[in-house]
């Protein structure tokens, strides 16, 4: 079902572009025109053209106050969300931290977690919270690529003292979730988020959603999700609503606040500091210094250009996908250029 550079001009006519069904039911998306949302339709069309010509975008959704205001590409097509998976896992953690099933202060050693070749005594002191914030100090090889621990000597950094983007941490956080809750990550996602939110394009088949990675490097594998842009946006909308959906708490509000608060600040000359003020618990917090409307904004982030951006000040969620992967990525600067241009379409 294709939507191409679509602004909702009215409820019955999408300029002949979209064949999107009216999914404004109990859990579906309602629509809103740019004018109703306070945005300029002409500028949004220009934004779409600019995005197409200056990024690897394949689909995106901008929702305002829970209603889709702008969409581009096939927003129903699932593809890998890469490291946005970590933010999804943090959402699943919330209820179990709240009810005491997961104790963030428990250590890797106390949980009996080890890995190929064993862990050093100092590494066993890393806590569950250290894993979520990527501050474990455990630089064991990861089963999945994309971390920044290559060349770091094991046993040299005490846990909780230094942020290093570390896929070993994130993968072990998945192991901890299953160990302490007794639930498969994908089954928990389906039961606790997909069904109550009414995600429309998720395929729960175990052939697609399964643990993956190089088991010769680590026992702790990755948990990759395949989601569409509109389903990514709905996860963001749940976060924007402080975890409440149809009157039910799916993710505790205090957990959302904790995860989206800076734990590890980014400061120059760190190149991330231009775009992010820091890292929380599996969420990236936006640098709003030059864009006050982004105060309090945060995002899930995946390789090659996958984003679930939540902008509370504007009641907006912006889901962005570059499904072309390495062949046609959207890197940080192009993405933020697009984000700033989207903000400029406000009246």
PLM feature spans:
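Active-site helix/loop module of the DD-peptidase/beta-lactamase fold
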Residues: 98-134, 181-222
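Active-site SXXK
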Residues: 66, 80-105, 131, 173-177, ...
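A short, well-structured edge-of-sheet supersecondary motif
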Residues: 41-75, 308-309, 315-319
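Active-site Gly/Thr loop motif
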Residues: 201, 206, 261-317
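Structured C-terminal helix/loop/strand segments within mature extracytoplasmic catalytic/sensor domains
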Residues: 297-347
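Active-site-proximal alpha-helical segments within enzyme catalytic domains
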Residues: 87, 172-176, 223-244, 306-322
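Active-site-proximal loop and beta-strand segments within enzyme catalytic domains
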Residues: 23-32, 37, 42-46, 52, ...
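Bacterial peptidoglycan biogenesis and beta-lactam-recognition machinery
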Residues: 95-103, 178-187, 194-202, 226-254
């Amino acid at each position: 079902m294709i939507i191409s550079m679509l602004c909702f001009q009215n409820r019955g006519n999408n300029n002949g572009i979209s064949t999107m069904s009216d999914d404004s039911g109990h859990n579906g998306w309602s629509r809103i025109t740019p004018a109703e949302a306070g945005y300029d339709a002409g500028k949004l069309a220009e934004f779409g053209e600019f995005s197409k010509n200056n990024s690897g975008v394949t689909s995106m959704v901008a929702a305002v106050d829970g209603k889709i205001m702008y969409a581009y590409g096939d927003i129903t097509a699932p593809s890998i969300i890469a490291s946005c998976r970590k933010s999804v896992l943090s959402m699943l953690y919330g209820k179990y931290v709240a009810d005491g099933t997961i104790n963030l202060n428990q250590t890797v050693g106390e949980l009996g977690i080890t890995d190929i070749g064993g862990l050093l005594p100092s590494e066993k002191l890393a806590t569950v919270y250290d894993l979520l914030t990527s501050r474990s100090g455990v630089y064991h090889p990861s089963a999945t690529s994309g971390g920044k621990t290559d060349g770091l000597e094991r046993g040299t950094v005490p846990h909780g003292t230094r942020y290093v983007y570390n896929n070993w941490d994130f993968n072990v956080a998945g192991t901890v979730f299953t160990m302490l809750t007794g639930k498969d990550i994908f089954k928990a996602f389906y039961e606790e988020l997909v069904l109550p939110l009414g995600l429309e394009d998720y395929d729960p088949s175990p052939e697609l959603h399964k643990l993956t990675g190089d088991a010769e490097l680590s026992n702790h594998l990755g948990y990759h999700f395949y989601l569409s842009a509109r389903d990514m946006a709905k996860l963001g909308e749940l976060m924007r609503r402080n975890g409440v959906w149809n009157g039910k708490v799916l993710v505790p509000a205090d957990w959302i606040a904790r995860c989206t608060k800076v734990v590890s600040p980014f400061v120059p000359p760190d190149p991330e500091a231009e775009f992010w003020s820091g890292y929380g618990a599996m969420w990236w917090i936006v640098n709003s210094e030059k864009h006050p409307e982004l105060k309090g904004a945060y995002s899930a982030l995946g390789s090659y250009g996958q984003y679930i951006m939540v902008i509370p000040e504007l009641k907006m969620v912006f889901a962005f996908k570059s499904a072309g992967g390495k062949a046609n990525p959207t890197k940080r600067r192009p993405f933020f250029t697009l984000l700033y241009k989207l903000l400029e379409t406000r009246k």
